[in-house]
Amino acid sequence: FTPEAFLQLISAFSSMFNARSIVDGLSLMNEESVGKQIAVKNLNISDEGLHPDNVGAFTFDGEGTPTQNINLIISGVLKNLLHSEATARKFGVQPTGHAGLGAKVSVSPDWLVVSNSENEKDKDESLSTTSTLKEYILIDELSAIHSGVKASQGSFSLPFDGWIVNDGKKTSIEAATVAGDILKVLTSIVKIDKEQIVTHQGISPHVWVENMSITGEA
């Protein structure tokens, strides 16, 4: 996955981190999920609304709670959830500054940042896993996010633009679809590049995932 495509996928399943979705029964997670391993050990994901590269940053959320940076996944472990005032009271924690006001108070991330955990043995192991690859598929951009994602079930089937890379030669892919389960994706990551790229929706490196289901033609 390119940084843009991986952020698209994580954002589509941000209900995993959303306490409002958990309360409403629309999340893959529950109250007991915090503290559990849900991804490979070298994956970090945080929400950093105050990051200097986030040009659309707000100091406060819709309820007036100060915006704050919060770790969501550290070394593959779910560490925190995103809260409004109401969900924070229900869970017995402090609001995190992620509420939006509308007909109903919503909760959503501001600026996702994906990185490789440091000092993990499997980081070096994963580098060797992909360094010898002669052919792979690069997913550049996902489409039909709203119709192709079943967030509460964890499944997705999404058209994508991308490339077949063979010995460094890139061939454009036409009319292809990638399908799978988000929790399986998070546990099937074999490499997270060191270099992070700033995009319009957050920051991420390239992320390599094995055993993806892809159909289509070049």
Regions found by a protein language model. Give the residues of each.
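Dual-mode signal for accessory low-complexity, basic/Gly-rich regions
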Residues: 17-19, 32-218
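Active-site pocket-lining segments that scaffold enzyme catalytic pockets across diverse folds
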Residues: 1-32
